[in-house]
Design a protein with these regions (language model features):
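Short linear loop/turn motifs
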Residues: 98-99, 286-289, 337, 372-375
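Short glycine-rich or small-residue beta-strand-to-loop segments that form or flank ligand, phosphate
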Residues: 65-66, 92-96, 339-344
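Conserved PLP-enzyme active-site core in the AAT-like
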Residues: 18-31, 38, 48-59, 71, ...
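Alpha/beta catalytic barrel-like cores
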Residues: 14, 19-26, 33-47, 51-52, ...
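Active-site-flanking structural segment that lines cofactor/substrate pockets
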Residues: 63-93
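Conserved C-terminal alpha-helix-loop-beta "cap" of PLP-dependent enzymes
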Residues: 322-431
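N-terminal mitochondrial targeting presequence
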Residues: 1-17
Length: 431
């Protein structure tokens, strides 16, 4: 595969021939894998298309909008039906007023837990922004955490290899008698593999056979949507009780301007939505202003394609950075469970240089230099390269990382894999 002709820009004009050849030679070697990714995208696109068709999505749904209470918004209600059908679960609620993946997860946890019950995290410490939701960081501030609410917390750490510790989980089920077992599929800011649907299914089986009666399995599914073809964590073939995620990641297709979802058991979805709005009103309230329904529906339709491009980007990032001698997870040849690629850079300067290179190659704010800082919800300084059309969208080309050892950068998204290819030219030059 030959590199494309150069064009004047702040980043490509400085790329050396060697940096270009490193990237495009890696892309050429990945061509057969990219073709397999395209076939997977086609199969998942068919599944989304069939869900739209079965629910008779029409122009009146796409063009519908609501204000005030939002009661009777046919577009919003049809969006929920499409998601429920697509993910093969009892209920799904997709809402613009879920502000983040963390917000969706918090709604699920507060809905499923009651004072005096126990939450068992089966994948170690929760993601940074969830620590203050649970109450493991910022305790005593009275901010309305699960801990403030009287929910006990316990965790089972992953193994040194980043796998679930099944023996310790079984012991934890017996010892803590949890009401909820929580699983985070993606790596977060940890240098470990993403967990598969097989891992989720195994946890569900373990909880059903060895856990206390009524124990529920909740899954943080951020970055996991539309990757594995068999379904999603809440699908009947896997069996989790509830999954939560963000529309400015995979299912929004880089078009949804905001929002998130909860999906799974009907009773748990209702309880989660009661935390989002109020008990009683639940899913019947919540306006979708202007073109919100169109943008979310269109993004959901495009999601298999944008995820497919992000998966190809993930493989290319891994191949290029492996070639430069860096540790990468997952390796370029490994199966993908999400589209996050973690690169262990080893020091602060390389982390900042990597993010600067990606920011320079972005369509938005290419002239801005990323600097580390304290971001609400995070305990450490974090640096972000996010020249995106939707603020904070990690379905678009982005990378970020905390300023702590091992100074890994976490790369996501890309509306087309060639966007990351051009950015990697700049990364290679800077490193």
């Amino acid at each position: 595969m030959k590199e494309p002709p150069s064009f004047p820009s702040s980043f490509s004009s400085a790329s050396s021939p060697s940096s270009s050849s490193i990237v495009w030679d890696a892309a050429a070697a990945l061509a057969p894998t990219f073709h397999a990714d395209d076939l997977r995208t086609a199969r998942l696109t068919r599944r989304v298309l069939e869900a739209f068709q079965r629910n008779k999505v029409g122009s009146h749904h796409v063009l519908s909008a609501s204000n005030g209470y939002g009661i009777g918004d046919c577009g919003r209600e049809t969006l929920d039906a499409v998601a429920r059908d697509l993910w093969d679960c009892e209920a799904a609620v997709v809402r613009a007023n879920i502000v983040s993946g963390t917000h969706a997860i918090a709604c699920g946890l507060f809905g499923a837990l009651r004072p005096g019950e126990t939450l068992l995290s089966c994948t170690g410490a929760p993601y940074d922004t969830l620590e203050e939701v649970v109450g493991t960081r910022g305790k005593g501030e009275g901010g309305g955490t699960l801990s403030d609410w009287g929910v006990e917390y316990a965790q089972v750490d992953l193994t040194e290899a980043g796998a679930m510790d099944w023996g310790a989980i079984e012991a934890g089920l017996q010892e803590t008698k949890p009401s909820v077992c929580f699983l985070q599929r993606s790596c977060g800011y940890n240098f470990r593999p993403t967990l598969s649907l097989g891992d989720v299914r195994r946890l569900v089986t373990l909880v059903r056979t060895r856990g206390p009666p009524g124990c529920k399995v909740l899954v943080d599914n951020c970055y996991g949507e539309f990757v594995e073809e068999e379904g999603e964590p809440c699908s009947a073939c896997v069996g989790a009780d509830l999954m939560m995620g963000s529309l400015i990641k995979s299912p929004g297709g880089t078009i949804a301007p905001c929002g998130g979802y909860v999906a799974g058991r009907k009773d748990l979805v209702a309880k989660a939505v009661a935390r989002l709005t109020v008990p009683g009103a639940g899913a019947d309230n919540g306006s979708h202003l202007g073109s919100t329904n169109r943008l979310i529906l269109q993004g959901l339709h495009l999601a298999p394609h944008t995820v497919g491009e992000a998966l190809k980007s993930s493989r290319l990032i891994a191949a290029v950075m492996e070639g430069l001698g860096f540790d990468v997870l997952p390796p370029s040849s490994a199966p993908r469970r999400d589209f996050v690629t973690a690169v262990r850079l080893g020091d602060r300067a390389k982390l900042l240089a990597f993010c600067e290179a990606v920011q320079e190659a972005s369509p938005i704010d290419s002239f801005v230099r990323p600097v580390p800082g304290h971001t609400p919800g995070y305990g450490d300084e974090v640096v972000f390269a996010d020249g995106t059309f939707v603020g904070g969208s990690t379905a678009e080309m982005t990378c970020d990382g905390p300023l702590r050892a091992p100074h890994a950068v976490f790369c996501q998204g890309g509306t087309h894999w060639t966007q990351w290819a051009l950015a990697l030219e700049n990364v290679v030059r800077k490193l």
